[in-house]
Design a protein with these regions (language model features):
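An N-terminal assembly and electron-transfer interface module characteristic of large anaerobic redox
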Residues: 1-437
Length: 437
């Protein structure tokens, strides 16, 4: 028997507070302002701890993806905290619309709400693919533009903060600068400004200039890149505060931006036409959108580089990275993007990589862990460690595995190997691989 779950209606926009599970903290802080400008009352959740995972396990099958356990557990924990009026609260979950099980989280959440005794709490879907067309929450074009601006600004703030914080003379200066700019950009977004390409291109150099002004002392440090399943990659709840741990080990950390994943999802819609046929209008539309995003992204990266910071290549160059390694048709979960990000990190000097993945995430095991040996063969300096996250995995074991990777990185710090790919003849002759160590 099919249960008639409550829908989020347009009328609830004025009466209900929408709770949003946290993931990429800075980007989501700005996204909250974009939603508030559009008339939504919302709150990004910050509740963490083992109780969240245990609550998720109570209402969701333990074989379900780890991110689903955490997201549903976090939302239920917030509801049961007593902080919110359960008759005036709604929940929201992002959906990519792809083949990954993440597209089904929303149905698992609705079932969990019924089991937990909250059958009347509505759940809305945040997506760009037209799922749940009858929902009162719709991703309109103006809201989408403000959301995109929030991601661009958040990516830049995170990238610059992570390159300044390990070297700052006054501890906490980079974090204060992030807070300052989030507040400043939040006011701009609430005023209905700051989201056009012209405004973003004007703002990027100002952000870079302020971070450049922070006094630092540059000393050699281990540089670590983080890739993986999108939730576990960014969420401190999902990866046991991985960034904080790496920084406690005196590392500079690089998280490839969230906008790369957004562009990856858009690119895949057009790539489907190339691989399988279909409507040419879809391909033309996605190409046009990607061109617009590319223009903004290049301005952001130029502002970073002009201020003396490391800036990766734009998405259009990232698409070329996995050529000869994995097909662009591999697009379940993070797909070819994860492989491309690892190559980009190695080439950019972040050859020590943590690949964070949920234990049962099949796409990640293929495009992440499955590509490690091939990348090591091409780039012998690559020092990649896949780390599994699930309710039964202990934080101590995860951190000990990372420490082993960092021990190798610290040995190489004084005598770094150039991230130079081997020739085809060298690869054919048997490239070095740590899998045989």
């Amino acid at each position: 028997m099919e249960y008639n779950y409550p829908k989020f209606t347009p009328e609830m926009k004025k009466t209900h507070t929408i709770l949003i599970p946290n993931m990429a903290i800075t980007q989501f802080r700005l996204l909250e302002y974009a939603l508030r400008y559009d008339g939504y009352k919302c709150e990004i959740l910050g509740n963490c701890g083992s109780a969240v995972a245990q609550l998720g396990l109570k209402y969701v099958h333990n074989d379900t993806c780890y991110p689903a356990l955490l997201v549903i557990g976090q939302l239920l924990d917030a509801i049961e905290s007593g902080k919110y009026d359960i008759h005036k609260v709604a929940l929201i979950l992002p959906q990519t619309g792809g083949g990954c099980r993440a597209s089904n989280y929303i149905h698992l959440l609705r079932k969990a709400l019924v089991k937990a005794g909250y059958p009347n709490i509505p759940v809305a879907s945040l997506n760009f693919s037209g799922l749940e067309k009858d929902s009162g929450f719709q991703m309109t074009l103006p809201l989408a533009r403000r959301a995109i601006a929030s991601v661009f600004y958040g990516d830049m703030l995170c990238a610059l903060r992570n390159q300044v914080a390990p070297y700052e003379n006054e501890k906490g200066a980079a974090d204060k600068m992030v807070d300052l700019w989030v507040e400043r950009l939040g006011r701009v977004l609430l005023a209905g400004k700051g989201f056009t390409s012209r405004e973003m291109k004007h703002t990027f150099p100002l952000i870079a200039r302020d971070f450049k002004s922070i006094p630092v002392t540059r000393v050699p440090k281990v540089k670590v890149g983080v890739v993986g399943e999108i939730y576990v990659k960014y969420s401190p709840l999902g990866n046991n505060d991985l960034q904080k741990f790496l920084e406690s080990q005196d590392c500079e950390v690089n998280f490839p931006g969230l906008m790369g994943f957004v562009q990856y999802c858009i690119f895949n819609m057009g790539e489907d036409h190339v691989l399988y046929g279909g409507k040419l209008a879809m391909k033309m539309g996605t190409d046009q959108l990607l061109n617009w995003l590319d223009s903004v992204e290049r301005s952001m990266l130029k502002a970073e580089a002009d201020a003396g910071f490391y800036a990766p290549g734009p998405f259009k160059e990232l698409v070329e990275k996995p050529e000869g390694i994995i097909s662009l048709g591999a697009k379940m979960g993070e797909g070819w993007l994860l492989t491309a990000e690892m190559i980009e990190l190695v080439q950019g000097g972040y050859g020590n990589i943590v690949c964070a993945q949920p234990f049962g995430c099949l796409p990640n095991h293929i495009v992440g862990k499955g590509m490690v040996n091939k990348i090591r063969a091409m780039y012998p300096s690559a020092n990649i460690t896949p780390i599994d996250y699930d309710p039964s995995a202990t934080r101590v074991n995860q951190e000990n595995r990372i420490k082993l990777m960092l021990a190798v990185a610290k040995e190489r710090l004084n005598a770094p190997a150039e991230a130079k790919p081997l020739t085809a003849e060298e690869i054919a002759g048997g490239a070095p691989s740590l899998s045989h160590a």
